[in-house]
Amino acid sequence: MKLAESMYAGPAHIGTLRVASSFRNVHAIMHAPLGDDYFNVMRSMLERERDFTPVTASIVDRHVLARGSQEKVVENIQRKDKEESPDLILLTPTCTSSILQEDLQNFVNRASETSTSDVLLADVNHYRVNELQAADRTLEQIVRFYIEKTRAKDPGSPDPGGAGRRQASSSTESGTEENLKGACGGEKTKKPSANILGMFTLGFHNQHDCRELKRLLAELDIEVNEVIPEGGLVSNLKNLPKAWFNIVPYREVGLMTAVYLEKEFGMPYTSTTPMGIIQTSAFIREMALMCHEVYNNSSTKCSQTDFESCLISNTKKVPKTYINKQTHFVSQAGWFARSIDCQNLTGQKTVVFGDATHAASMTKILVREMGIHVVCAGTYCKHDADWFREQVSGFCDQVLITDDHSQIGDIISQIEPAAIFGTQMERHIGK
């Protein structure tokens, strides 16, 4: 822990609360002292949604320190269960309350006995992970919880996980067909479909990105099966394996869930971010290959009409035709690259800094599609440093991995770039 004037990624409990408040009819209880309960105010101010933020703070005060937290935490869970009737109550400590070393799992077990809602403890090490890592872990934990719960209710259903593991060691046709079964005995959708994983509250332009992704999928005749967690219901998580593949737009949140679904159900996924003409083209080609693979291996074939109208009918011709049409007649990227606004930056020095996904994608767009010189590309996602270095290698002169805003400020002062592509922090530095 460190005292900082400002932070790029917050503490772990903020990530957990972002995931919980993104789902519909999920309530989070934060076991925290006064001062750690600012999430409600922050989200209400930034999102400006009609509904109240579904987070309750179970305050650690002097009485709790004297008698222990169990009675108060269990009482808060039971009270919210009666008042709100949520599908899920998620309990999370904070860095400060973790110091008490209390057995919160025992509190959850006790509260579960008298609650009609599901009660789950966020399994996150608050001293080792940041906001983004905690969000990724929490989303995977919730998905795992509900898929295993559905399996337990229907023990006679096929075990897609077992089929997936058998397929890894044996390529028999029966194993492949079992592996392509949907969740808990359900089958894949008739038409190609995808899950979008990782859209959640307080994300950077997540709503706009989700809208564009849905439009892209609709134009390719691919259905959207589920979007989680933003606006999703935990009761629908059992339907995730019915999709043909998963889309992870941002590496920071959703990647663990995609890996889990691939391991358990053999579901392919793409983590290519469709930013810029080149990466969007690669994204479309990946979807075409995944659709074709699932169609060839699936025991349930879609109709001939669906087959001929969608992406899977020809993995080379259909994507290429669509990409060429969008590039030459629809997209305005080429026009912007020739505009005076972009021409003024051609050959000029720039700095890019942000989360790993956006910083890497923006660096590639500036260099490959606009001819702009990126002197320094950096990210505050230190846990994903190796991937980031690999992505921006050859596109910039210098790579910076840090979560200290003063370091990026010093770099910007030394370089004196013509433009800065970064976070709100870099905006203040540039001024």
UniProtKB/Swiss-Prot annotation:
Catalytic activity: chlorophyllide a + oxidized 2[4Fe-4S]-[ferredoxin] + 2 ADP + 2 phosphate = protochlorophyllide a + reduced 2[4Fe-4S]-[ferredoxin] + 2 ATP + 2 H2O
Signal peptide span: none
Domain of life per record: Eukaryota
Localization in the cell: Plastid, Chloroplast
Disordered, as annotated region: 150-187
Keyword rRNA-binding among record annotations: no
UniProt remark on cofactor binding: Binds 1 [4Fe-4S] cluster per heterodimer. The cluster is bound at the heterodimer interface by residues from both subunits.
Keyword field contains Kinase: no
Main location class: plastid
Name assigned to this protein: Light-independent protochlorophyllide reductase subunit B
Source organism (scientific name): Chlamydomonas applanata (Chlamydomonas humicola)
High-level lineage: Eukaryota, Viridiplantae, Chlorophyta, core chlorophytes, Chlorophyceae
